[in-house]
Amino acid sequence: MRASELLAPTLRETPAEAEIVSHQLLLRGGFIRKAAAGIYTYLPLGRRVLAKIEQIIREEMDRAGGQEVVLPIIQPAELWQESGRWEVYGEEMFRLQDRHRRQFCLGPTHEEIITALVRSEVTSYKQLPLLLYQIQNKYRDERRPRFGLLRGREFIMKDLYSFDLDQEGLNQSYRKMYQAYSNVFRRCGLDFRPVQADSGAIGGNYSHEFMALATAGEALLVYCRECDYAANVEIAVAKALPMIATENPAPLKEVATPGQKTVAEICTFLEVTPDRLIKTLFYEADGQLIAALVRGDRELNEVKLQNHLGCRHLLLADPERVRKATGAPVGFVGPVGLQGIPLYADLEIPYLVNGVAGANREGYHLVNVNPGRDFNPTAVVDIRQVEAGEPCPQCGAPLAQARGIEVGQVFQLGTKYSGALGANYTDARGQEHPIVMGCYGIGVSRTMAAIVEQCHDDQGIIWPLSVAPYQVVIIPASLKDDGQRQVAEGLYRELAAAGVEVVYDDRDERAGLKFVEADLIGYPLRITVGKRTITSGTVDVKWRSRKEETPLPLEGLSAQIQALLAREMEKYR
């Protein structure tokens, strides 16, 4: 490709809307352009990167036995109503009507439509197992689209669905996909961690997320450096860390704490440490008022609480409802003496001795609160957020914490959708059973952004060779020099004929500008044809990821470049 013919409109300045590195560089490098909030056009360079990522995905899905299909973006409401998710998705779902007033949606995901397909086409055990996948646009009406490709309203995903006879078959499919996903992200050049995860709105009983480590990541994960434990903090297992009792339980006592509502204020006023406080947080679980208890130095994990309760909706309770139920405003409520409100205590709460809690009377707290003596929780469960430095639940070593971008997730769905939509098979004895399903997604456009978040410097993007829009850029220092131009032209034609993806920067621009733009776009290998090419018969070759330049002779140059590329590509096999 000649640069004079390539649509790659670079920007000198960073657009004000771009908050994170990937958004900034993909805009500045001419890879994407904003069409509307959370909706982007992919320009030629961006489309080439996507195509490389998609090809890696296809190769790994096909190797695992997957078959590619294309499912409709517009989906009938009836299927979502059958599964019970039409209302669950709420305002995130784009809904529309046809001219006959029939309801449809723009697919945010494709469990219903793929299950309906298999329901009509698969009837016998002889047709299973089955792996079907697609690469397709998805749509979610995000309340606040941001971070470029990381949280958009239109995005590209790969979905694979497995259909098996039983749980053993699902386990095999899950292991296949887990390995295939590891292969995909390794080949894309990502530093990633598979972590245990919550299954969220898709549902199911077992799930892993594949996290690309990045400071811009919206997800928080903990992992162990000594063993293979890693988990999203939403479900990371917390060990109870008992406090060593240095005193005996003292009589319960009410003390005045006028105007002291926050943990910090109460600790200062009563001269106690935060780990002595019992935070009492009120929620509405599908409308029912409940209370959750954690230590004052801990954060409640709402995902864990919701999973334990098994409720569909979990919302912080309205303060006025709390006042009516307890007789006190938020900040002065506690577990002692509460009537008719279920209490869910974190694992650490029973170990407290002479703790502090609200007295359910405005302006007062209780001191010397002892669980078991002064109140009994409805249940004691793991509902707190895990923090860095805590012991690993598997080996006991200190946990590390990092931020990550979710680029993929795998789910064991079981019979959640096949049962709801009646996707059954008949076994060898003529008995009918629901098909056992798994779901496996990769955010293709998110993966592109995640690569940029990891692979960049102050000058621009540093694409891994496996996903770069072009592998090589040739820059003549001066097009006015006939010798340089002829060498550059000849090398360009020779490399292109050999199948190398090469850009020849033949634009009538300063060499300095071409170097700056080549670094911004992130071509992996740069070949500079300059004065030394004419005087000494060498060109300067430089990897974008390295500082040093290497002179190479013109004789046999094309073969040398191809050998360099082949060796580098071995990293991504």
From Swiss-Prot:
Keywords, comma-separated and alphabetical: Aminoacyl-tRNA synthetase, ATP-binding, Cytoplasm, Ligase, Nucleotide-binding, Protein biosynthesis
InterPro entries in the cross-refs: aa-tRNA-synt_IIb, aa-tRNA-synth_II, aa-tRNA-synth_II/BPL/LPL, Anticodon-bd, Anticodon-bd_dom_sf, Pro-tRNA-ligase_IIa, Pro-tRNA-synth_IIa_bac-type, Pro-tRNA-Synthase_IIa_type1
Top EC group: ligase
GO BP field: prolyl-tRNA aminoacylation
Any GO MF annotation of the entry: proline-tRNA ligase activity
Subcellular location: Cytoplasm
EC identifiers of the protein: 6.1.1.15
Entry's Gene Ontology cellular component terms: cytosol
Reaction(s) the record says it catalyses: tRNA(Pro) + L-proline + ATP = L-prolyl-tRNA(Pro) + AMP + diphosphate
SUPFAM superfamilies reported for this sequence: Class II aaRS ABD-related, Class II aaRS and biotin synthetases, YbaK/ProRS associated domain
Coiled coil (residue ranges): none
Main location as per UniProt: cytoplasm
Subunit note: Homodimer.
PANTHER family linked: MITOCHONDRIAL RIBOSOME PROTEIN L39/PROLYL-TRNA LIGASE FAMILY MEMBER, PROLINE--TRNA LIGASE
Function: Catalyzes the attachment of proline to tRNA(Pro) in a two-step reaction: proline is first activated by ATP to form Pro-AMP and then transferred to the acceptor end of tRNA(Pro). As ProRS can inadvertently accommodate and process non-cognate amino acids such as alanine and cysteine, to avoid such errors it has two additional distinct editing activities against alanine. One activity is designated as 'pretransfer' editing and involves the tRNA(Pro)-independent hydrolysis of activated Ala-AMP.
Family in the record: Belongs to the class-II aminoacyl-tRNA synthetase family. ProS type 1 subfamily.
Domains: entry comment: Consists of three domains: the N-terminal catalytic domain, the editing domain and the C-terminal anticodon-binding domain.
Name under which the protein is recorded: Proline--tRNA ligase
